[in-house]
């Protein structure tokens, strides 16, 4: 199923979200408990304002995302380029690529899997250690040579974003 949004707005008294872009959705069922949902598109923009002020403005380019759910949990894979800005982050441009799909059990955090996030001059590989911890491997020059490694609770990573 294909969708094309042109300035679709969702609004409340204090917030407004604007959606622009294209998205293709695919759905598959391999068994009674095995379901896959995939989203893809060339460009999709989400802009959020609160009381007239910009909260965030994200554009995903060349995106692919899929989630497979079974009775045991689910796996997720994402690949996209993100261009974003907000009052706290100006003109961030990163490429996100799944190295190995993130595997989730009963918890909200993945128990395994890794993704690579590449910016202008550096990259970080984010690897799920378990449902409680995540490891960050920083390549300061973005050449794959690890210059710093840090393991932390998922909550700490989430709060830093």
Q: Language-model segments: what does each one mean?
A:
Residues 1-161:
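Low-complexity, intrinsically disordered segments exposed to solvent
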């Amino acid at each position: 199923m294909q969708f094309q949004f042109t300035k679709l707005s969702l609004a409340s008294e204090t917030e407004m979200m604007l959606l622009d872009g294209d998205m293709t959705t695919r759905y598959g069922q391999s068994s009674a408990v095995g379901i896959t949902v995939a989203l893809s598109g060339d460009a999709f923009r989400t802009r959020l304002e609160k009381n007239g002020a910009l909260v965030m403005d994200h554009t995903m380019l060349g995106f692919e995302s899929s989630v497979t759910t079974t009775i045991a949990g689910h796996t997720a894979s994402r690949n996209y380029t993100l261009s974003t800005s907000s009052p706290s982050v100006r003109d961030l441009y990163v490429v996100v690529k799944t190295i190995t799909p993130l595997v989730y059990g009963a918890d909200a955090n993945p128990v395994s899997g890794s993704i690579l996030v590449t910016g202008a001059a550096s990259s970080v590989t984010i690897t799920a250690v378990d449902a409680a911890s995540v490891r960050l491997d920083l390549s300061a020059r973005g050449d794959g040579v690890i210059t710093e490694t840090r393991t932390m609770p998922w909550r700490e990573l989430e709060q830093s974003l």
